[in-house]
Every structure is written in structure tokens, then in C-alpha cells.
Amino acid sequence: MSTTIIGFPRLGEFRELKFTTEKYFRHEISAEELLAAAKELRAKHWNIVKEKGISEIPSNDFSHYDNVLDAAFLFNVVPSSVQGLELTDLERYFALARGYQGEKGDVRALPMKKWFNTNYHYIVPKFEKETQVKLAGHKIFDEFAEAKELGLVTRPVVVGPFTLLQVSDFEDGVAPADFVDALVVAYQEVFAKLAELGAERIQLDEPSLVKDLSAEEKALFLDLYKKLLADKKGLEVLVQTYFGDVRDIYADLVQLPVDAIGLDFVEGKKTLELVKGGFPADKTLYAGIVNGKNIWRNNYEKSLAVLEQIPAENIVLTSSCSLLHVPFTTANEEFEPAILNHFAFAVEKLDEIRDLDAIRNGGGAEALAANKELFATERVGENAELRARIAGLTDADYTRLPVFAEREEIQHKTLNLPPLPTTTIGSFPQTKEVRAKRLAFRKGELSQEDYDKFLAEQIDEWIKWQEEVGFDVLVHGEFERNDMVEYFGQNLSGYLFSKNGWVQSYGMRGVKPPIIWGDVTRLNPITVKWSSYAQSRTDKPVKGMLTGPVTILNWSFPREDISIKDSTLQIALAIKDEVLDLEAAGVKIIQIDEAALREKLPLRRSDWYEDYLDWAIPAFRLVHSTVAPDTQIHTHMCYSEFTDIIPAIDNMDADVISFEASRSNLEILDELKAKNFQTEVGPGVYDIHSPRVPNEGEIDHTIEAILAKVPSKKVWINPDCGLKTRGIPETKASLVRLVEAAKAARQHLK
């Protein structure tokens, strides 16, 4: 038996890649300096994996932005609008991810979507009629050669052709099958070149195999792989899956002439059952036994019990998915040993994989004994009062009265807003000064009084600016908040916060998910102080801004000793208390963000309701079920696909929902119309994830497109997400255009 991992975090132990890349974006360093820093980081990471005793080390799991974008770039899947720009390869690569606005042209970024059921986001490639699939990049070869210079023969990793097609968009008139032959040729060229460089095995990531597969999709996969594997160019091929089991394709997959198959024994409900039914003796099984998504220590006895049931002769122990979904290392944390011992970040998971391998081979007695002792000790007690409150919930606690249609009429009269009301999603740019003041306050270098004065000044400035520009519903800007989940978690019992537990979310953006350690209750009012203050500074309505229970759960590292449903209900009651306090303080519009609602949606449709939506949607309703009819409840969602769960979203019974739509060309609106969606909607009219400012007329055209599909009385005008990470000049310029476009559109309604 040997050991490996599917992939390793990219940003660095202290987010070195993020800070270096952002310097490049600000033109403070050259492309050569960026590439040199990245090379140094890769060497450091390979060395860590090697020193931990992992026998197979992956390469090309590193990315300057996103691994799906890397694959698209490698195979020349680049839209003609970007191909035509006179840019360097690196500039073109970043133009796909971030858009480009300069003397050489003006192009929007490609869309961004959630990577399966994680909080990682990938850039969505687009296959056009003009797309000429061919081997065009060299990153995968460069990184293999780099590692070889360090004495390491790595296993190169690339997104497999089936998943590349499944996660991409296609221009009208072309389909995935049109690109099969060209992709086969291009991938085989990669095989040949890697074999020439001295590679022995390539990892083709095919997580799309764990989803429900139609007969057409299965046929596409088999057509691709039969052609691809007809000539492997002397390279061994590992088809690596993760995030679930491959029940729909297993029988065909094991018959293909692949050399190895990677299966997920953590999230794959049926994986063990499938392999117990038979696994070919001539293939190697890469067994994903250590959870790549959560930060809790592996229970060695449970993992060993699973491994003992696997009939395969050749097994490589690995992570259940890439370790990019967990923080780098616990070494920089300051928790008490009694707490820290329960956590394993990426580096520690290398130890776990190595330990399990050693125990399987007759060693590791000390590691096994320590692990048994850890799991034999009670970790945390229960909150009896909270458990009783949950046990006492009835159907009435999940139902808001009167019904939506009656509330809508009441709210229109009470709020008296113009048609196409304008607002933003919540946060305004957090400048260096804002972050520095927060840090100084946290360190005790700034008094509470001085910090409060600074925050009040920020709120005053932006409330005044919103009034001057002409916004109808204002926000206070969230200057007191570091992260939309961490800020709430810091005011809830049962939460722990890492010092350096950063995880890549999209591009160079990292998030630091809090850890749910025990039962969750609200310690004190969280947002009332600043929401009330902001409302006191204006006669216009100011939205109270909360993060919803499902998003707080999904953007935290959840407990594994109770169900995520039970954890979510605990959080829902805490947020419910906050909603009622905001209402009592005179806040008439309360936004409860559920940005991550879709994130934990099972990958198989048959599991959607029973395993998730049947409790996630009621948990949201529990939060707002007892507010008055004239209190308007908003929610917001971003980065996701919703067209297939629209009835469930309507069932959240919010009064208004805003969502990311600009990058996806407002496709969701057709489905809203088809499904007779009742909730008022604010489709994002411009993309905030790119620094470009919408052109004059751009937002006008977007509003026109929205009004062609949604009745004007149901439409709100807003950006597609919060503005925390954007710069002030681009933010103000974009928002002025948004308000001007909304006012112009109102004239056409009359």
C-alpha cells in the first residue's frame, strides 16, 4: 500500500500567493516576479508533502486562479472576445477570470459557479462555434519539470475531459459531443509530452461522475474514454472521483482500460457497497478515506474498519477530495491542546494518511492508541434549555401569516417606495483604513469609544452618499464586520475561530470558516446597535443585515457528532432572536442572506428534499415566521445555480430575493416566469466580482431585459453581491450608473 493526496492548498501557509498576486494586479510587481514567487511556493509545498512521507506527490494541482480555468486555457477553450485581445498569456488568463478594461479592449469576466457542493468557485469555460480545441498551454509540463528538478517524479493532475465538458457553457448551435474527438487528441498530446518528460501516471479529475448521469451523459463519458484510452502514450491513467459515489457508471468504469480509479469513501454513500461487489485485480484503487472537506481528526478505528472490507489488492490511501477545502496547518493556531488535538488541517491530514498506512502495515501502534484515547473522551456537553426549545417547535413556528400576497400589499403601502426600488446588497468597500482600525481595536490599541466613533463616521458618510445619489433603500455598509459568518459566530456560543484557518473561495479570495464546537445560542444582540444608528441618520428605510442559518452552517466547519439539521436549527433560533430585536428597534426591512443555500444540496436529485431542502427551507422560515406583516424580509443568494430549485426558494416565503445573475445573462428569469415565482426579485444588474465599471447603457439594457420577463411591480434594482472587496472609485461609479438607469427605466413605465 502507498499514500497520496488528490491536491494540496494553493494560497500558501500565510496566503503568500494571494498577497503576491494582488501586488501584480496593482502593477506593483512584474509578471516575472509573480511567476517566480509561485514557483518558490510550489517547491515549498512539494517538500512538505514529501517530508510527511507521502509516497505519490501530485503536481499541477496548483493554480494562479482556478484549476478549471487552467484546463480551459491548456486546451484553448478561450472565447473569441478574449482571443482577439493583444495580451500576454498571463494577461489573457486573468482577463478570463476577472475581465479586462483598458487600452487593449473591454471584456467581461467569464461566469463563476460553485464547485459541486463546496464553497470553492470555478470559472465556467465557454465552448463556442469558433473554439478550436488543441493543446495550447504548457503549465502542466512546466510544473512537472520543476518538481523533477527537485528530485520528485510527481503525478500531474488535470480536470478530466468529461468533467470539463459537464461544467462548461456552450454557445447555441454547439454541444459537448462536437468536441469529443478534438479533446481526445489534445489530451493524448498531454499524455505523450508528459511521458516524454518522465511522468509515469496522470490524474484525470472526474467528479462529474458522482452526479446523476443520464443515458446520454454515460454514452458521452464512454465515448470519450474509449477513444482516449486507446492510446495512453505509455502513461498510466488514474480516473479520480470525489464528493460522492459513482453508482451510475461504476460497472462501466471498472471495465475501461484505466490503470487506477479513485473513489470517495467519506461522502460516497454507496462506494463501499460498490467495491465489495468487485474491483478488478489489474487496477489500483485510490481509496479516499481521510475527509478533505472538514477539519476534525480522522477516527482511525472507523477508517480501518472500512479499509478492511475493501477487496481490492492494490490500494493507495488518499484524501476524499483535494485538501484545498481545508486550512493549511494547525501549527499556527493558539487553541488549548485539549481543543487543538481534535483538529486536522491539510498538513495534519498528511500525517493521518501516513498513520493509517502504517497501521495497515502492522506499525503505528502509538498513533492508533493516541487516536483511540482522543475519541474515547467526551468533547463537549449539551445545552439542555436549547435542546428543549427545539423539541418544543411546532408547525406554526415555521409558518408566517398572513400569506405573501396580503403582506406584499401591506408593505407597498407602508414603505411607499417608487417602482423599481434601488438598493445594494449590504456591504461597502472595506478600505485599508477600515481594516487597520478593526485590527487596532482587536489588538487593544484602539479604545471602544474611538472605534465606535470611526464606525459612526463611516456610516454617516455612506448614508449621506446613498441619499445624494438617490438610493431608495439604504444600507449601513457593514464596516464593523470582518466576514459575514465570522462576525455572527463571534456572538454565538459554541463557536471557535482559527487564527490562520484560511481556505480558498474564489481566485485569490480566502475565507476563514469558523468551527462549530458545541451547541449554538445567541450571547447578546449582534447587529441592533449599528442598524439602529444608521436608521437614525436618515428618513429613508435602512436594511438590517443578517446572515441566515443555512449559510452560517454551510460556511462553517460543522460538527460531526450531531446532524447538520440539528446544528442549523440551533443557529436559526439564535438568528430569530436577532430578527425580533431588530424589528423591535424600528427596522422595517431585514435582509437575511442565504448566499450558500445551495452549497450543501446533495449532488443527486433524489436526495435533494429528504436529505436537505425539507429541513433547510423550514429553518429559514423559522427565523422570520413571527415578524409583523409590514416588516419586509429580504434574502440574498450568490454564485449559484437556482433554476432547478425555484419552487423551494419561493417556499422560503421571503418578501424579496436578490441574486447573482449578471454573469449568467439573467438565465434564471425565464425559469422564474415559467414557475410562476411569487417573491419580488432583485436580479443583479452588474457583476461586482470584476473591477470593471459597467459601460453607459449597459445597466439600462440589463433592466430592459429583466422587465421583459418579470412584472415591474416585482422588480428591485441592485448589484449582484456585496461590495466589500471592491475599490471605492469603481463602486461609486457603478452605483451612480445603477441609480441613473433605474430612474430612466421608471420613465418608460409611465
From Swiss-Prot:
Domain of life, source organism: Bacteria
Cofactor: Zn(2+)
Pathway annotation: Amino-acid biosynthesis; L-methionine biosynthesis via de novo pathway; L-methionine from L-homocysteine (MetE route): step 1/1
GO-annotated molecular function: 5-methyltetrahydropteroyltriglutamate-homocysteine S-methyltransferase activity; zinc ion binding
GO biological process: methionine biosynthetic process; methylation
EC number: 2.1.1.14
InterPro entries: Cbl-indep_Met_Synth_N (IPR013215), Cobalamin-indep_Met_synthase (IPR006276), Met_Synth_C/arc (IPR002629), UROD/MetE-like_sf (IPR038071)
Binding-site list for L-homocysteine: I425, G426, S427, E478, D593
Binding positions (5-methyltetrahydropteroyltri-L-glutamate): R15, E16, L17, K18, K114, W555, E599
Annotated cofactor note: Binds 1 zinc ion per subunit.
Reactions performed catalytically: 5-methyltetrahydropteroyltri-L-glutamate + L-homocysteine = tetrahydropteroyltri-L-glutamate + L-methionine
Sites where the protein binds Zn(2+): H636, C638, E660, C721
Binding site for L-methionine: I425, G426, S427, E478, D593
Gene3D superfamilies linked: 3.20.20.210
Keywords: Amino-acid biosynthesis, Metal-binding, Methionine biosynthesis, Methyltransferase, Repeat, Transferase, Zinc
Active site: H689 (proton donor)
Alphabetical list of Pfam families matching this protein: Meth_synt_1, Meth_synt_2
Keyword Metal-binding: yes
The keyword Transferase belongs to this UniProt entry's keyword annotation: yes
Chain's role: Catalyzes the transfer of a methyl group from 5-methyltetrahydrofolate to homocysteine resulting in methionine formation.
Protein family: Belongs to the vitamin-B12 independent methionine synthase family.
The name this protein goes by in its record: 5-methyltetrahydropteroyltriglutamate--homocysteine methyltransferase
UniProt organism field: Streptococcus sanguinis (strain SK36)
Gene that encodes the chain: metE
